[in-house]
Amino acid sequence: MKKVLFTLLVSVLAISACKDDSGEAPAPLDPLAVGEVAELNSSLAYNFSATYCGPCLNPGAQVSRDINTNLGENGYFIKMHPDGSYASIAVTEEATAFETNAWNLAVEAGTAQAGYRSWPSFGVNSELMRGSNFATYTDYITYSGEQASIYRNSPCKANIGSKFMLEGKKLTLKYKLQSFQGLEGRHRIAFYVVENDQNSQQWGLHEGGTDPESLPVIHSPLLIGSLTGTFGEEDINGLSAGEALEGTVEYDLKYMDYDKAPRMGGNYNDVNVEPVLDNLDVFAIIFDGNSSNYKFVNISKAERVTP
């Protein structure tokens, strides 16, 4: 009898603990709720290259991997295929706009040189570069890592914490933009969708040989679109130190259709958007929009939550 009474008592206490003072059970915790945002700078390195370019295996694929490796924990890398890059997969409007903006920033800074808009080229944060800027290959691939280390230890103006969930092709993301040093003037935030495991053949110079049907090359993380436009959709006009801004983004990935983007002909890289769902990441980027072009401020990776 004592055992039965004890069991009943524990059950009553457990039920009571699940109710508030009004006797109602509290609402379930939101799995997408964003907690404290890290006061931390991360860098963005990006590479404009192609798949239909014989000489582009090294600067296109291998360099991408080397740059990504050298970033370490201090930043993130995104491979982009802009219009005119002779890529046969994921030629996106976002990549084209990003390349144009990177070039315009170089012009604005007075560092633009002939050939910068000829792929492949790469950048780190708001700086655009080509291999001709460096004396050796090692200098070339380690530069972004060195810059990322410096930026990591700089004062953090603001950062974004975000979480997303996929139900079918419907993506729901919640975010918190936290200001630490203050964001003066106009800023924007954008959310980029990338595929983190894209294997596609590299025409002319594949890993494993020069035959077009040889082993594929890894093109990852590969930009396939944006949830909020290339540089965001809404202006954030000033955010004082200590202030935060929260929001929700919903997007149906059936509208992304990145595999239908303009591209070179051929059957080397036929892609179905379905497998992307399992290999999908989302990056949140803060941009400074106080000039006619968008300057990089910070980047973070959204946490994926299982429904």
Describe the function of each predicted region:
Residues S11, A38-N41, Y46, G115, ...:
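A broadly tuned, weak detector of single residues within folded domains
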Residues I15, A50-C53, Y255:
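Mature extracytoplasmic/luminal segments of secretory-pathway proteins
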Residues M1-L44, P307:
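Bacterial Sec-dependent N-terminal signal peptides
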Residues A33-G84:
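Local sequence-structure signature of Cys/Sec-based thiol-disulfide redox active-site neighborhoods
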Residues I15-C18, I67, W203-G208:
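General "foldedness" signal
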Residues K79-P307:
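Short, conserved sequence motifs used for protein processing/export or organelle targeting and
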